């Protein structure tokens, strides 16, 4: 029986085929600034598909100012923004800040807490779900005040943020042993083994995709019982898996390979590019991969438009017609269209660059009309809200 996502995407693919003659140009030509100032970033990939792109989001396109900054330490992932809170996974803690003021509101984990936080969270309907150890499992936390709601014990330590199914009833989390299913009420219900620890996870509809440290890419359907569809061996540890509207997936692996995989033909490669996406990517009309530089690839055809050497180090986020990322001492915004030029020779790509106190390594997020990022140095780290 075809999955819900396959039925939806099949209709979308037929529509796309009918428009093929109209879509051969650069998709960036059709990108426009977002018009919604109230968007959120409720999970590490921004959306269930982990495409790291909010086309409707308002975000600064000109030199920003600081809404606020907050001192923190050892950030491990990009900020999560939802329901008036900014959440940050820092070493063994989950820290919460007020979205408007940056005031610290609550914390889970740390030396004086029983929980050892191991993953970034996902926020679903006012609750943050996060992977913890000692004991291993998923912890549900009230987003408003940090109250612990429940803990669901798992057979092994979590390695990825949870994802949620389309009914918002069931969570899937990656672990060192594979995948585990937990209801949003805290009832564990299944476990699936993989050959190595899960390093990347995404979902849409009733399908779940998992990448592992050993380079395996798995496709599953039905989060109620998680049935396998196919498995592919890739060339390196999987960094990111993003699901496309047309039914395929884009994957990046350690070492920088970015490729598109056919979801209807057991994961066969449609296109592949080497040494481009070791930091991750934004999957929009184009795929914008961040390695040391920024590369634009036509997501449908695989054509590489341009690559710019920008010394970037942060997993990117996209909003409207702009890509946001960072590096040593800066957060920056770049035009999706690549500015003016031909091939790799381009100008006016950078919309703005904001100096920060440290290196931006863990990724940026776009929400509530602002860009959120952390900068780390030898003395600690700072969480920035730029608008």
Language-model region placement:
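Extracytoplasmic/lumenal domain signature
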Residues: 3, 29-118, 122-387
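N-terminal secretory signal peptides and thylakoid transit peptides that target proteins
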Residues: 1-20
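Sec-dependent signal peptide cleavage junction
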Residues: 20-31
